[in-house]
């Protein structure tokens, strides 16, 4: 008898769907979502993240084939699959030496083709665990338990989704075509995620030097990123992050909006067509958009430079902030609740420039510069408590 597919596979995706729905609004899931149970609301059943598009669960999925291989604890996993893949660490109590890889293929019994073409092997010289197939059914799923410090090199084709949970290898590389990539509580020196048409979702805290690129209409949603260097880019999709704790971050989108919660460090934001929103900035912030609007709360100041070529800018600050101000736009509105000393106004070529000081700022590097030549610059007071947006 073949055992049922592990509860971790289904349970973790139920958790992901709940978190994604609450934070990311991720919409339709093409992968394991169809296996999770619907939940009831108001007497009717609904699916997390999509009320109409996700099909009802099919017959029970079972473990169809299993492998256990002895490996180096510091090797790497190379996977090339057209189906779903989930990777998590070995149980340290069961495998204290961390020298095994467990592989299981799950699917509807008798309904998964291409198992004979699935290669599962370990190369001792390269210290590389390979899982490769181009014939396995796209609705199958491969579950891997690997050593905690394993590196990852994963490519999925078609609609194959990838989830990596709690792995701490030096290098983690994930590439998908149309499947969703999920990183949950992952640590590494270098983390690279790329998708041509799927979503990228980071749950918990993801540590490392991080590079995420999402093409076409792919969205990127993030709980928390922490590391020295972070680069995240989208084309037409939303880029949304709750927390960034980095030395240097560069986030960009061609046409999608950039929506950030609390950010710390040197942050650069660029969007050609989309809007930029930052709930709280602590450090240096440089944000620019061609046609979109900018809305920023500056909680602690390094140097802030904001530019919207055709849109408007809203800058919110606490009353205690010390800063030099230079606000330029077709119109400039400084709220009366903000006390600005030495305020001066200059008009030239249909552009108004207002300069001044907040709270007798003495350090010249503490600047807020906002430039919206075709729009309005609004400067207003907001408390830190208001920035938390608890009503949401």
Curated annotation (Swiss-Prot):
Disordered, as annotated region: 39-60
Segment forming the signal sequence: none
Domain of life according to the entry: Eukaryota
Cellular component terms (Gene Ontology): mitochondrion
Name this protein carries in UniProt: Protein FAM185A
Organism: Homo sapiens
Gene name per UniProt: FAM185A
